[in-house]
A protein has these predicted regions:
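Bateman/CBS regulatory modules and CBS-like beta-alpha motifs in cytosolic regions of diverse proteins
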Residues: 1-31, 36-44, 67-114, 125-126, ...
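Charged, low-complexity, helix/coiled-coil-prone segments
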Residues: 13, 50-61, 81, 87
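Short beta->alpha transition motifs characteristic of CBS
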Residues: 31, 43-60, 119-124, 131-148
């Protein structure tokens, strides 16, 4: 199993890009986030669906007490108006700095170790300043399944 065989090419988020465009790219490529390229052209962070939703759609107390919340909290749903507002925001305020990255010639085991170290399920493959794509735990799992069943 080669790391380069697991790369999913994606677009990068850029300053001023709308949340909707980031979500659309992530959903189309089945990745949880994409890298953020700053105005100087450097990968400066990651734009994550989870992070945007966490900051905009769930109050902190729900995160803190999520395991004891009941299932009848309908008044805390995400209304369409809120969704429209969030997806039209610029992604800039939701960038997580220092994303998990790896070089294209690294072994898959190192990719897994980097994911664990960063407590994430995906990372970006970068060769110098050149972004090649994303590798996810799902991609590694699919490759392992395919390899094991062949």
């Amino acid at each position: 199993m080669q790391l380069t065989d697991l790369i999913v090419p994606t677009a990068v988020a850029t300053p001023g890009m709308r949340v909707a465009d980031v979500f659309r790219e992530c959903i189309a490529k089945q990745v949880p986030g994409i890298p953020f390229r700053d105005a100087k052209g450097h990968i400066a962070g990651k734009a994550s669906i989870r992070h945007v939703l966490k900051l905009n759609c769930i109050p902190d107390f729900m995160v803190t007490h999520g395991s004891i919340l009941g299932d009848q909290i309908d008044e805390l749903t995400i209304p369409a108006e809120k969704a429209r507002h969030v997806i039209n925001l610029a992604i800039d305020d939701f960038i997580i700095p220092d994303p998990a990255v790896i070089g294209p010639h690294s072994p898959v085991a190192k990719a897994l170790a980097v994911m664990e170290r960063h407590n994430t399920t995906y990372l970006f493959v970068i060769d110098g300043d050149n972004y090649l794509g994303t590798i996810s735990i799902m991609g590694v799992g699919a490759a392992a399944l395919s390899l094991g069943e062949s």
